[in-house]
A protein has these predicted regions:
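Positively charged n-region of N-terminal signal peptides that target proteins for export
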Residues: 1-4
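Bacterial N-terminal signal peptides
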Residues: 6-15
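A Zn2+-metalloprotease active-site environment signal
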Residues: 18-380
């Protein structure tokens, strides 16, 4: 396993010299600095599949801690079966895929590197049939198979490594994985993937749904419902809040279905409503928390205080949500303060900042290949 290390370059100050000599020395040093920077720009942070898994597991734990895990085993198994049907059609079927239902009324979904897909209880309530669920899960699966979060981290170079931070087996040290997880969590929770990443996830995701027998256009139905849900919101909110605009995505999905001749027609509404017996709450009824979720990995003082006092007072609204791999304008502390202040003014986005449950433990269950094969027979 090879790991390329991003070098952190430091240049000493120029000692006092005669003017002419100093100018010459400055010119030489400037040239050296330019050459060194060009060399550094060629370096990349290599994240192995094992490192990706560790990274994704840590991010998943943070999501479960932040939102809680819905403890209904039948619902958890059902979502996992739909997800596994899609995952086996993907370019990375061998990943140890996990599909987790988060215990929050907010309508959202998150893809964590290495095979961890999360969908909220609120999102399940918004979806109307299995094909729509497949469209959502297929989109999130593609973020993972295409390594969108991993590549965003690599491009941003938010973490610089020293030789001591490479593990004894050649992988990344745990301290580095934790730093990467902080950046990845911010990227995921704030839901601002690159435009091309979103287009790819829509295209490949509906392709996976089609291969499994689900109607690919079902994702468009979810998007339309989301558009109506958020029509009075000033900013993008919750699931699929990233650009491009929903109207553009709808047009693109229709074009993909036509050009790629995607003709599957399975909707599977009856089986869906057998397991998902609840509906999404209107935005006005979704409780939100105070704090700066996403800017500090969900562990800000405001967030902790809100959780500690949420039973004593009505939760305050807050801002927050995705930025590109944790990169923000200004210092993190400044951004945290700004978001918290916005929350104090009553500015918040319910789906994005929804209060979660208190149990972070994942539902203990196993889904076998035979169960997946049998489940797939019901797609019609």
């Amino acid at each position: 396993m090879k790991t390329t290390i991003v070098l952190v370059l430091a240049f000493s100050a120029i000692a006092a010299t005669p003017a002419q000599a100093q100018l010459g020395g400055l010119s030489d040093r400037l040239k050296q600095a330019q050459e060194a920077k060009a060399k550094v720009d060629k370096f990349d942070l290599r994240i192995s599949e094992a490192d990706e898994r560790k990274l994704g597991e840590e991010v998943s734990q943070r999501l479960c801690q932040e939102f809680g895990v819905y403890q209904n085993k039948e619902v958890a198994r059902y979502v996992a079966l739909v997800g596994r049907v899609l995952a086996q059609e993907s370019s990375r079927p061998g990943l140890d895929w996990q599909f987790i239902v988060l215990d929050t009324d907010g309508v959202n979904a998150f893809a964590s590197p290495g095979g961890f897909v999360h969908i909220t209880r609120g999102a399940l309530g918004l979806v109307r049939n299995e094909a729509e669920l497949a469209g959502v899960l297929g989109h999130e699966i593609t973020h993972i198979t295409a390594k969108h979060t991993v590549r965003a981290i690599q491009k941003s170079k938010v973490v610089s490594l020293g030789a001591s931070e490479v593990g004894s087996s050649g992988g990344l040290a745990q301290s580095v994985v934790s730093r990467l997880a902080e950046a990845a969590y911010s990227n995921i929770i704030n839901n601002k993937f690159d435009r091309n990443d979103e287009v790819e996830s829509d295209k490949v995701g509906i392709g996976l749904a089609n291969k499994a027998g689900y109607a690919p256009g079902a994702l468009s139905d979810v998007l339309k419902r989301l558009e109506d849900r958020n029509k009075n919101q000033e900013q993008p909110n919750g699931m699929f809040a990233s650009h491009p605009l929903i109207t553009d995505r709808l047009e693109n999905i229709a074009k993909i279905i036509k050009d790629d001749k995607l003709t599957a027609s399975g909707r599977v509404g009856t089986r869906y409503t057998k397991f998902i017996t609840f509906e999404a709450k209107p935005l006005s009824e979704v409780p939100v928390i105070a704090g700066a979720r996403g800017l500090t990995g969900g562990d800000s003082k405001d967030s902790k205080d809100a959780k500690a006092t949420e039973k004593k007072a009505e939760p305050k609204k807050k801002g927050g949500l995705l930025g590109k791999v944790g990169l923000t304008s200004g210092s993190q502390a400044q951004n945290t303060q700004t978001v918290a202040s916005a929350g104090a003014r009553g500015l918040g986005q319910p789906d994005r900042d929804a209060k979660g449950g208190t149990n972070p433990n994942k539902v203990d269950m196993t889904v076998t290949a035979a169960e997946v094969a049998e489940f797939k027979k019901g797609i019609a």
